[in-house]
């Protein structure tokens, strides 16, 4: 047998063996051989993750160089939200969304929302010059970043520590009313300042009345009392700003004045005894007819006595929340940082929530509401957009009480260059505070959603798995009867199943953005970004400072001095005429049906 014949026989044998193996395998179907790979043309879903080129096109890539930033070098020229990162050698490249968007971050307690996400974002905000507000339950963020923001980035820093009010900066919520009233009083021709004082007085009154939640529609038949109470509050805030001493012009003085004005007074000019009138009506009678405070209080002033008392009681009930000796140390003095300074200069406001005292949580809602409304006024003065982007880092957004009008904030603020980053632990928190419709409005207006690190029993993981969508994958079945067979088909499979979401490693998050495919985004611990902390930012203990209030008598005296022509004297004839007014005679019944 020649060598060529031998080679041919061997080749034929090999082919025969391969055919036998192929025949065996074709009849030995296994379920393990069916892989869930992407197939088809999107018949059951087109969900997929973004490609590298799509990520590069969607997000700005910024070198995250903390060392140089803190020296004032190579500061970023873009502003926005840090949503992810990638490593390039020893350098870290941040993925930044520079759009006017709101962000919703969802993650269970302990997944690293602060260490992985919040700290890099605050560092970037400081480096890019964005003013920001940050809520903090532990106080760690302001202690770590207060000094850095002030020392390296030249920020105005204000800490409102509701846990330790004597170690807190002041926040007089009437500050802007007082400021513009002083400008107007120094120049009576400056009507713009007067109008701003009136506008901020109405904003403050509306914010206070809405502390309890609801609006005119929710109050139903009682809507009149709440609307009238709002006008009454605005009226007294204006009067306090106009006539009060500098250290008396605060919200607790308003409470005291309303309480005092409930008491009846008798005019000293009366010759004979007459029925006493309420202190509130006596005060309003001393004002000129064209005084705006009198107009604002018109609903209450022209109501029946009982209705007017109900209006004043409604206002008092809303102000009860401010009656706290510790809170007075924050509310009754100056203001470290107002809305105008916050928008025009690099500024940071840290609000510390006491986890052990939920009775003070309303202040967070109040501060955010008032600051937001005042920012809108500033934006309108600048053509509808702020000159510099403002960030609200609302950590524990689902923990503190409902922010009245939060749905409108998420809907309307984006176009004004206000970005809200709401950090929650689950959708159930939003549902509890804002209801099903409120939750949907908030989630529908957050163009960025970042999530990861779910608890084993998390229901939010199911919601987000569904939100990621489905992809078309291969599936099939195998039969091992008399004749072995296999069938293949296309099915829809979630892009990430619930168990895959729950088993994601710490530091890995999913980022979804409107109009783009989602991406798996790794985030590093803050020290791997190059972030280091220095000495903690601590405010000095100011001690218990004496609080002064404006009294009803002082206010009436100042009004009489300013408007002496409004003093009224009641003549003896007028009083006699009032007393001798004939009573309605009762007509006797004479019969009939």
Predicted region positions:
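Basic- and hydrophobic-enriched, low-structure N-terminal and domain-boundary segments
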Residues: 1-111, 115-123, 128, 166, ...
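Short intrinsically disordered, low-complexity coil segments enriched in acidic
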Residues: 2-3, 463, 467, 516-519
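P-loop NTPase motor domains
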Residues: 82-90, 94-418, 433-436, 496-520, ...
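Short, surface-exposed polybasic-aromatic patches that bind anionic ligands, especially phosphate groups
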Residues: 524
